[in-house]
Each structure stands twice: as structure tokens, then as C-alpha cells.
Amino acid sequence: MSEGPKGLAIAAPASGSGKTTLTLGLLRALTRRGLRVQPFKNGPDYIDPAFHAAAAGRASFNLDGWAMDRPQLHALAGQAAGADLVIFEGAMGLYDGPADPGRSGRGTSAEIARMFGWPVVLVLDVKGQGQSAAATALGFARHPEAPPLAGVILNHVASPRHEAMIRAEMDRLGLRVLGALPRRSDLSLPERHLGLVQAEEQAGLEATLEALADFVAAHVDLEALLSVAGAGPAPGAGAWAVPPAGRIALARDAAFSFVYPHMLEAWRRAGVTVLPFSPLADQAPDPSADLVWLPGGYPELHAGRIAAATRFKAGLRAFAETRSVHGECGGYMVLGARLVDAEGRAHAMAGLLGLVTSYEKRRLHLGYRSADLLAPLPGYGAGSRLYGHEFHYSTILEQPDAPLAKVCDAAGAPVAETGSVRGHVTGSFFHLIAG
């Protein structure tokens, strides 16, 4: 049986342990050595894959065991063909995921690592502890669902004495230390309410990536790291999503940037013509398109400019008279009547739906979603079940149109954010991952 690509899973006991910092440093450091490194990210995160791509020079893809079936996961893993190494960054803690399983499991980083045979490098934030860090690592290694543990990398090490103390206990317990990162507050990446500030907004990103690569190369044994990479069987037969149209006008700018790389790759493979346009530059969608797609992003940060984008809104309305328009999360809000910003100012949106949303009183909406369509959505008929993710802080003030879907959380409980449909226009707060 042929092997899949060799790889490593970068995981941790919890969020905030330093996975992304280490991953970006590794991607750039190994790429500088001439290796072709294929990055992946566990779960539905939009932002980390864009940083991965900047660091590695090739697209990073989400591997989501809750929302994706195995053929889709295998198709995406096949993107590593020709690479020398896979670096798979986990999400949250190694075993964290919804309590109720989805399509291929609970969406944990451990499940994906086991599926593709990638040993785990466990990142441990050792600030405020000593030998107890080894007990944490040992517990993770002995978990009944544990993938092979290749070793650990210590983060936020206070001093050489601190490092030596922890290394000695790791050695005693038979755990391999692959590196120790000292405290460096100047290498953190800025954050926004949905996570890191996006890669394209990061001033001096190249310099940051180079600094991270230097830092990781100085404190991680890269040769030892490469020696413990592993692989399982080659990915099985894959399946790519069928695109919703042949010519898609796609909004792409600072307000509309949350597009999953796997969706764009599926469109590319099917020969779709993508026609990008910028609402912030007051550009109307290409009238030759079959479909307009408004992805999510940060429209609340640009609400005034969107409200003033008369050519964009007029072109969108004209398009919607005869052809399909769909919006996700931020795109859904822009299709609505009004968006109220954090200061209480109301901004007129496209008015193709009656939706009114507000950021004046922020409320977190977060989690996986399944959606049983009550009306057709581009590419899917009524009755189809879709899988996605919701993450925003807006509040619905009015949602008067017919519901697009019956939407439930990962536990199967209905949620109020049903989406909307009016004529050729559809929208939802959940970001579609797979159907």
C-alpha cells in the first residue's frame, strides 16, 4: 500500500498555547531550506490559512471532520501531492470538538492526525509551571484516542534553568523535547474580534514571518523535527463540491474576504470563471455572471463606504432582478435593509432583503451549523442538508423574509438565524463548508 505525504500535526492542550506562532515560523523556516511544505488547518478557521499561505508560498486548506465527509477530506489531503512535508495546525486543544459527532467525527485535531498518520508535536505553554508540564504531555500521549506523539515543544520558557528542569522530567517520562521557545512578546500577531487580523491587512508581514522563522530555527531542532514526521496510507478517492454556477461574480476586498480555499479550488477544478469585484471601490458585479456571491468579512468596519457605494448597490439590484445573489454572514448583512454600527449609526445596505442587524449591543454567535434548506440556494435544492459554521457579534433586529433553512447547532438544537430568501436573493449567517 502506498503512503501518503509525510507530515506533522502541531497541536496543544488549549488555545493560546502558541500553535500559530510555531506553525508560521516552521512553515517559513522549512520553506527557506528549499522544502515544499503543504499547510493545513483543522476546523473552520478562515484567518490562519491565509497566514499559512503567506509563510509557505502555497494555499492552505481547512480539514474539518465535523462538516466534511471522508471523500472531501481525502480530496483536500491530496493537495499535498508533490510536497516534501505536511504541517497541519490544530485548533483549540488536541481533543476539543463538539460533543455530538458530525460527518466524519467530532472535528478534533486528533481525529485528522490519526486519519492521515501525522504524528503530533505538542506545544506546551510552560509559563508558571515546571515539571508538571511533563505530566500534561504524558496525559495527552496516553489518551485512548491519542495519535502518536512525536515530541513536545516548550513555549514561554523563562530561563535556561526553567528549560533544564522541564527537560529532565520529560526525559524521565520518556518524552522527547524538540525545542524550547523563550518568552518573546514582540513576536505576537495582532488580533481582532474574529481572531487574528487578516494576513492581507498585516503591515510588514514578510518581516514578521522572517523573524518568526529565525526565532523557530534558533530554538527548535529542525533536523529532529523532520526525522519524526510520519505518514499513513495515501489518501483515498476524493470528491470535490459541484460549483453553483459557471461564471461567478465574487466580492473580494477588505470587507468581503472570508472565502474558503477549498471552495475556490473546487470552482477552479470545475472550470468556473471567477469575476472578482470590490464593493468598497464601488464596483458593480459583472453583468455577464450567472451568480453573485457576497462572502463574509468585516462590513461593520466599512459600513459607511458600503452605504455610499451607489454603483455597487444599483448593479447588485439590477442583477438580482433576473439571477441569483447569495450572501454569507457579512454578505448577508449587506444584502439587508440596514446595518447599525457599534456607535448606533444606521447605514443603508442593498435592501434586497428586509434584514436589519446591529453591532450596538454585541452578542457572540459561535459554532457549527447544519442547515436543512427550505428553499433552493445556488448549487443546492430545497431539502438539501448543508454544513457550516457561524461566528459573528451582530444582533438581528428584523428578519421579515421567508426563512432559507431550518438551522441547528452541533447538538441539533434549532437556532434563530434561519437565513432569508426573497425572489432570486438568499442569505445566511452560516458560512458554508460542505453540502
From Swiss-Prot:
Residues in GATase cobBQ-type domain copies: 247-435
EC number: 6.3.5.9
Pathway membership, UniProt: Cofactor biosynthesis; adenosylcobalamin biosynthesis; cob(II)yrinate a,c-diamide from precorrin-2 (aerobic route): step 9/10
Cofactor(s) required, per the database record: Mg(2+)
Transmembrane listed as a keyword: no
GO molecular-function term, one example from the UniProt record: hydrogenobyrinic acid a,c-diamide synthase (glutamine-hydrolysing) activity
BP term (GO), one: cobalamin biosynthetic process
Site (described: Increases nucleophilicity of active site Cys): H431
Active-site feature positions: C329 (nucleophile)
Keyword Ligase among UniProt keywords: yes
Keyword annotations from UniProtKB, A to Z: ATP-binding, Cobalamin biosynthesis, Glutamine amidotransferase, Ligase, Magnesium, Nucleotide-binding
Catalytic activity: hydrogenobyrinate + 2 L-glutamine + 2 ATP + 2 H2O = hydrogenobyrinate a,c-diamide + 2 L-glutamate + 2 ADP + 2 phosphate + 2 H(+)
SUPFAM superfamilies: Class I glutamine amidotransferase-like, P-loop containing nucleoside triphosphate hydrolases
Transmembrane segments: none
Role of this protein: Catalyzes the ATP-dependent amidation of the two carboxylate groups at positions a and c of hydrogenobyrinate, using either L-glutamine or ammonia as the nitrogen source.
Family: Belongs to the CobB/CbiA family.
Other information: The a and c carboxylates of hydrogenobyrinate are activated for nucleophilic attack via formation of a phosphorylated intermediate by ATP. CobB catalyzes first the amidation of the c-carboxylate, and then that of the a-carboxylate.
Domain notes: Comprises of two domains. The C-terminal domain contains the binding site for glutamine and catalyzes the hydrolysis of this substrate to glutamate and ammonia. The N-terminal domain is anticipated to bind ATP and hydrogenobyrinate and catalyzes the ultimate synthesis of the diamide product. The ammonia produced via the glutaminase domain is probably translocated to the adjacent domain via a molecular tunnel, where it reacts with an activated intermediate.
Protein's name according to its UniProt entry: Hydrogenobyrinate a,c-diamide synthase
Source organism (scientific name): Rhodobacter capsulatus (strain ATCC BAA-309 / NBRC 16581 / SB1003)
